[in-house]
Amino acid sequence: MSGRGKGAGKARAKAKSRSARAGLQFPVGRVHRFLRKGNYAQRVGAGAPVYLAAVLEYLAAEILELAGNAARDNKKTRIIPRHLQLAVRNDEELNKLLSGVTIAQGGVLPNIQAVLLPKKTSKASK
């Protein structure tokens, strides 16, 4: 015996990413690296990149859900920038969050002022 103790025959556990531990799709390690390299603070806590990755994943999922609905309403199976624009601008909270953002190839929301619409003519009853 070479003095390795009781756990000599046990293999090391399979490595599990921080994204997998947190149950996220977005990369926690990459977010952590960006936080460190971006000079936002001298030190970055262990929970900060997990929280930020979760927030980013939630926002992406929310926008994609609404854009998918917009694509389906237009009888399309592929999301294009127009669908993203319609999704963001028709949602009050996302519109406020992304008010300063221009979506390339997004177009504008269809909107006709009420004054410009033709007047309703009612038939005079006798």
UniProtKB/Swiss-Prot annotation:
Modified residues (N-acetylserine): 2
Region feature (Disordered): 1-20
Residues with PTM N5-methylglutamine: 105
Any single Gene Ontology cellular-component annotation: nucleosome
PTM characteristics: Monoubiquitination of Lys-120 gives a specific tag for epigenetic transcriptional repression.
Annotated localization: Nucleus; Chromosome
Matches recorded under Gene3D superfamilies: Histone, subunit A
Keywords associated with the record: Acetylation, Chromosome, DNA-binding, Isopeptide bond, Methylation, Nucleosome core, Nucleus, Phosphoprotein, Ubl conjugation
InterPro entries: Histone-fold, Histone_H2A, Histone_H2A/H2B/H3, Histone_H2A_C, Histone_H2A_CS
Biased composition (Basic residues): 7-19
Keyword Ubl conjugation: yes
PROSITE patterns in the cross-refs: HISTONE_H2A (PS00046)
Family named by the database record: Belongs to the histone H2A family.
Known role: Core component of nucleosome. Nucleosomes wrap and compact DNA into chromatin, limiting DNA accessibility to the cellular machineries which require DNA as a template. Histones thereby play a central role in transcription regulation, DNA repair, DNA replication and chromosomal stability. DNA accessibility is regulated via a complex set of post-translational modifications of histones, also called histone code, and nucleosome remodeling.
Name the UniProt record assigns to this protein: Late histone H2A.L3
Species of origin: Strongylocentrotus purpuratus
Biological classification of the source: Eukaryota, Metazoa, Echinodermata, Eleutherozoa, Echinozoa
